[in-house]
Amino acid sequence: MPHTQSILVVDDELDIVVIFRQALARHGYAVFGFTDPALALEHFKLNSRDYALVISAVRMPPMSGFELAASVKAIKPDAKIVLMSAFEVNDLEFSTSAIKANDLLRKPVDMKTLVQRVRVAMAN
């Protein structure tokens, strides 16, 4: 079944953006990817109503995923956000709850888990 809303994927590693875009597109999602969070934020400002979900890495230059998520929420308070990090989840719990992210994925993320967690985040 095709999805009508888009997902914004932001990670400073191009390979992750490409793999996520391919995996989610196979499940009918329209996916737009950025390796620069500042450019992603500018794009989101212009197109926020089109996005059902933002998936972002936590650690990226020049803006962290937490900063990006806070900016996304300032633009669209009901935005759904999934953060991902290779670092321990316990170190991130406070920040995740502070911005009210819908989920936190631990890198590396297998594609089956990614698709399942995206479905859950978008349904809530």
Task: Locate each region found by the language model.
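Alpha4 helix (beta4-alpha4-beta5 surface) of REC/receiver domains from two-component response regulators
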Residues: E67, F87-L104, K112, Q116
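Two-component/phosphorelay signaling modules centered on CheY-like receiver
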Residues: L14-F32, A121
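The short loop immediately C-terminal to the conserved phospho-acceptor aspartate in CheY-like receiver
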Residues: V58-R59, R119
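Acidic catalytic/metal-coordinating carboxylates
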Residues: T35-D36, S64-L68
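Short amphipathic alpha-helix used as the core "switch/output" element in two-component signaling
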Residues: E42, F66-P77
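Acidic, metal-coordinating helix/loop segments flanking the phosphotransfer/catalytic sites
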Residues: G33-L53
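The feature encodes the CheY-like receiver
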Residues: V17, P61, V89
